[in-house]
Curated annotation (Swiss-Prot):
GO CC term, one of those recorded: extracellular region
Name of the protein in question: Potassium channel toxin alpha-KTx 1.18
Gene3D superfamilies registered for this protein in UniProt: Knottin, scorpion toxin-like (3.30.30.10)
Species assigned in the record: Rhopalurus junceus (Caribbean blue scorpion)
A Pfam family it matches: Toxin_2
Tissue-specific expression: Expressed by the venom gland.
Residue numbers marked as site, Aromatic residue of the functional dyad: Y36
Domain topic, free-text comment: Has the structural arrangement of an alpha-helix connected to antiparallel beta-sheets by disulfide bonds (CS-alpha/beta).
Length: 37
């Protein structure tokens, strides 16, 4: 799932993904965070 959180590196997505989908598995893709529930 792609969330509307800007990023430059994947670790910036981990806490945002934790909030959004409940897991901290995420990557920065195309300047947005992609989370893996």
């Amino acid at each position: 799932i792609v969330i509307d959180v800007p990023c430059t590196v994947s670790k910036e997505c981990w806490s945002a993904c934790k909030k959004a989908v409940g897991t901290d598995r995420g990557k920065c893709m195309g300047k947005k965070c992609k989370c893996y529930p």
